């Protein structure tokens, strides 16, 4: 499964195989056919 890269805003997310490297950045996640940034950093690390 492809991993998501960290994004600055909730609406903008880019899909990459890298994990989130900063706590301030939000992780991108797929939600209802759309990519959204998750608020918790721990969730980004899991996927």
UniProtKB/Swiss-Prot annotation:
Please give the tissue specificity annotation from the record for this chain. Answer: Testis.
Q: Keyword check for Transferase, yes or no.
A: no
Q: Which keywords fit this entry according to its UniProt record? A: Chromosome, Developmental protein, Differentiation, DNA condensation, DNA-binding, Nucleosome core, Nucleus, Spermatogenesis
Query: What does the record list as GO biological process?
Result: cell differentiation; chromosome condensation; spermatogenesis
User: Where does it live in the cell?
Assistant: Nucleus; Chromosome
Q: Which domain of life is it from?
A: Eukaryota
MF annotations from Gene Ontology? DNA binding
Q: Hey, which family's this protein in? A: Belongs to the protamine P1 family.
This one is known as Sperm protamine P1
- The organism of origin for this protein: Myotis daubentonii
Tell me what gene encodes this.
PRM1
């Amino acid at each position: 499964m492809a991993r998501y890269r960290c994004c600055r805003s909730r609406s903008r997310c880019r899909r990459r195989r890298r994990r989130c490297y900063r706590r301030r950045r939000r992780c991108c996640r797929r939600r209802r056919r759309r990519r959204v940034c998750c608020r918790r950093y721990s969730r980004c690390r899991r996927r």
